Amino acid sequence: MGLTEIMLVLVSLAFVATAAAHDCQNGTRPASEEKREGCDYYCWNTETKSWDKFFFGNGERCFYNNGDEGLCQNGECHLTTDSGVPNDTDAKIEETEEELEA
C-alpha cells in the first residue's frame, strides 16, 4: 500500500470518527439520550479510549425516572414539579409563618 492510499485511509477514518462524534456535543441531545435522566451524558471517545462527559443546553427539558421534570441550567436539572422534598423557599415560608404567629 502506497503513501497515498495510507493517507486516504487515515483521512477516511478521521471523517468517520468526526461524523460519529457529531452527535456528542454540549448543548445537543443525541437521539440515543432521549431517555437519559438528569442533564449530563457520556459519549465514548475512540481517540482517548475513554468516556467524555457532556451537558444538555440551558433550557433543555430534563427528568428523573421517578416522574420529576425540570429544565437544565448549567448542567443541573432544576425541577419544575413538586418533588415532595423541602427546598429553600419552603423553609423561608415556614419561618415567616412562625414569625407571624409569635
UniProtKB/Swiss-Prot annotation:
InterPro entries: Ixonnexin-like
GO CC annotations on file: extracellular region
Coiled-coil region: none
Region (Disordered) residue spans: 83-102
CDD domains per record: TSLPI_Salp14_NTD
Keyword Signal tagged: yes
Glycan-carrying positions: 26, 87
Signal peptide residue numbers: 1-21
Pfam families named in the record: TSGP1
Recorded superkingdom: Eukaryota
Disruption phenotype: RNAi-mediated knockdown results in impaired feeding of adult ticks, observed as decline in the engorgement weights. No significant effects on the ability of nymphs to feed.
Location(s) in or outside the cell: Secreted
Tissue specificity statement from the Swiss-Prot or TrEMBL entry: Salivary gland (at protein level). Saliva (at protein level). Midgut.
Induction remarks: Up-regulated in salivary glands and midgut following blood feeding.
Keyword entries, A-Z: Glycoprotein, Secreted, Signal
Note, other: Does not show anticoagulant activity in in vitro assays.
Function field: Salivary protein that facilitates blood feeding of adult ticks on vertebrate species. Inhibits the lectin pathway of complement system activation in the host.
Family of this protein: Belongs to the salp14 family.
Protein name per Swiss-Prot or TrEMBL: Salivary protein Salp9
Origin species: Ixodes scapularis (Black-legged tick)
